């Protein structure tokens, strides 16, 4: 059944209709205005919809039918690792011992949850090669900021207040320079070379006595492994700086190489990406931070520790940067990640990376004759095509991304990283079959042919979606954020 004419919840409203019934008021009414003052009390009631329970159910069911997620179809959003989230994660998360507890409970009454979090810390230490891990950060960007605050605290503990700059590659995630700025640093860009990797000569030029850290993703955002990482670590460390690992692309290297073994001093992980917490809807996420022994004293407190009589919170950490989130992280996402790690095991996680890399390289080689491939070497978990060939024919990458919607696919990430013209960043992940990959490849080839033979159909896409071509510029500059009857 089509829901193209799906009404807004306000349009379902009819005065006097309700979805509830309450008994007669048997207590004294409370005069808010007299108690709080008129400036804190609405003079007119809010314009809320008046609907029945059935209206509400149909409204949200209709919205869910319009939604698109990993369970709906292929979701090759580059640098987001939109893999399938095993449903056993949800089964475990719904166990009473996890779902019916409260963070204010005495630690002695939640020893099972404490054991899980401690074991997760230990697993992440092993996976990353870090000395200690905190689960507190809520998501990736906060994990970046947390790591940078620890690096800042480390330098200041040594009286080294002149380290005011953080180096960020030109292919980095936008959150990297943003996190550096929020942490009080100046972001400095290091260029990529012709291979799409960090230019070592330029790195040597920008590193100095004012360098606090180099932020790096490896593989980088182009899906390419920074093969000179040991040299880069040496350059930064000789200058007195620290090397920070953005864990966005860990899905490509698990079981093969660890950030700690590459010389990184701090790392954040995206448990909602690599370790199958459901994401894409705005949260929650989880961004644990791991550090070397030299930085461990500065981790957010408390840490979970194992004692002879059970598990406890360690609050006695005088050099800690303090809490970065209430309680102890996003427990539900941490639990799902723990379930995934225990389900897969060490060999399973290694296979994850193998298949993620295999799928990406297969797709890249199947499409390199149709689209420009700026960096033709083997990729890791993702690759970046360029729509520059199609742009010369009057069709932009944005147009092709919208055309993909007509075929039932979520588009790849577009126009990122910024150092690729008309970029299309594709990350298939390990959970997709060859048949799914082939279907997407055929669709991309079909769209490329349309660009040559019938460009208007691509330029005016999408045609089959409930909402057609939107004016993104107007939406960004003049958003309508509330209902006006």
UniProtKB/Swiss-Prot annotation:
Keywords: Oxidoreductase, Pyridoxal phosphate
Family named by the database record: Belongs to the GcvP family. C-terminal subunit subfamily.
Enzyme Commission number(s) from the entry: 1.4.4.2
InterPro entries per UniProt: GcvPB (IPR023012), GDC-P_C (IPR049316), GDC-P_N (IPR049315), GDC_P (IPR020581), PyrdxlP-dep_Trfase (IPR015424), PyrdxlP-dep_Trfase_major (IPR015421), PyrdxlP-dep_Trfase_small (IPR015422)
Protein name as catalogued: Probable glycine dehydrogenase (decarboxylating) subunit 2
Function per UniProt: The glycine cleavage system catalyzes the degradation of glycine. The P protein binds the alpha-amino group of glycine through its pyridoxal phosphate cofactor; CO(2) is released and the remaining methylamine moiety is then transferred to the lipoamide cofactor of the H protein.
Keyword Kinase among record annotations: no
One MF term in the entry's GO annotations: glycine binding
GO biological process per UniProt: glycine decarboxylation via glycine cleavage system
Keyword Oxidoreductase: yes
Cellular compartments per GO CC: cytosol; glycine cleavage complex
Required cofactor names: pyridoxal 5'-phosphate
Subunit structure: The glycine cleavage system is composed of four proteins: P, T, L and H. In this organism, the P 'protein' is a heterodimer of two subunits.
Residues annotated with N6-(pyridoxal phosphate)lysine modification: 273
Catalysis performed (reactions): N(6)-[(R)-lipoyl]-L-lysyl-[glycine-cleavage complex H protein] + glycine + H(+) = N(6)-[(R)-S(8)-aminomethyldihydrolipoyl]-L-lysyl-[glycine-cleavage complex H protein] + CO2
CDD domains associated with the record: GDC-P
């Amino acid at each position: 059944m089509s829901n193209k004419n799906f009404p807004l919840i306000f349009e379902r409203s009819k005065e006097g209709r309700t979805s509830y019934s309450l008994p007669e008021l048997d207590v004294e009414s409370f005069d808010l205005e007299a108690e709080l003052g008129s400036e804190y009390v609405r003079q007119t009631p809010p314009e809320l919809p008046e609907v029945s329970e059935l209206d509400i159910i149909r409204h949200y069911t209709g919205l869910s039918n319009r939604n698109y997620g990993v369970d709906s179809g292929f979701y090759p959003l580059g640098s987001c690792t939109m893999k399938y989230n095993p449903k056993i994660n949800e089964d475990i998360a719904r166990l009473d011992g996890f779902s019916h507890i409260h963070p204010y409970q005495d630690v002695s009454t939640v020893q099972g949850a404490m054991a899980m979090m401690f074991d997760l810390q230990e697993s992440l230490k092993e996976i990353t090669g870090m000395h200690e891990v905190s689960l507190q950060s809520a998501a990736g960007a906060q994990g970046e900021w947390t790591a940078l605050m620890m690096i800042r605290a480390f330098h200041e503990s040594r009286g080294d207040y002149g380290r005011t700059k953080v180096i960020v590659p030109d292919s980095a995630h936008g959150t990297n320079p943003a996190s550096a700025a929020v942490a009080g640093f100046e972001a400095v860009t290091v260029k990529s070379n012709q291979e799409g990797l960090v230019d070592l000569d330029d790195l040597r030029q920008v590193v100095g006595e004012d360098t606090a850290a180099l932020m790096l993703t490896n593989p980088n955002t182009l899906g390419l492994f920074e093969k000179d990482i040991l040299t880069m670590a040496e350059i930064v460390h000789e200058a007195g700086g620290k090397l920070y690992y953005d864990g966005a692309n860990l899905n490509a290297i698990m079981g093969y190489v660890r950030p700690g073994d590459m010389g990184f001093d701090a790392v954040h992980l995206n448990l909602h990406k690599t370790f199958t917490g459901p994401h894409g809807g705005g949260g929650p996420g989880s961004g644990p931070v791991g550090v070397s022994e030299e930085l461990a004293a500065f981790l957010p407190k408390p840490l979970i520790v194992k004692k002879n009589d059970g598990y406890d919170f360690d609050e006695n950490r005088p050099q800690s940067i303090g809490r970065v989130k209430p309680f102890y992280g996003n427990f539900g996402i941490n639990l799902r990640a723990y379930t995934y790690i225990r389900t897969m095991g060490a060999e399973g996680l290694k296979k994850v990376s193998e298949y993620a890399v295999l799928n990406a390289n297969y797709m890249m080689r199947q499409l390199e004759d149709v689209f420009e491939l700026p960096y033709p070497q083997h990729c890791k978990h993702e690759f970046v095509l360029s729509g520059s060939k199609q742009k010369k024919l009057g069709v932009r990458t944005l147009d092709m991304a919208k055309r993909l919607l007509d075929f039932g696919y979520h588009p790849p990430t577009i126009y990122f990283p910024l150092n690729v013209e008309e970029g299309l960043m594709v990350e298939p992940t390990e959970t997709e079959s060859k048949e799914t990959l082939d279907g997407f490849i055929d669709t991309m080839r079909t769209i490329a042919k349309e660009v040559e033979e019938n460009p208007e159909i691509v330029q005016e896409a999408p045609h089959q979606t409930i909402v057609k071509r939107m004016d993104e510029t107007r939406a960004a500059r003049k958003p309508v954020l509330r209902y006006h009857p």
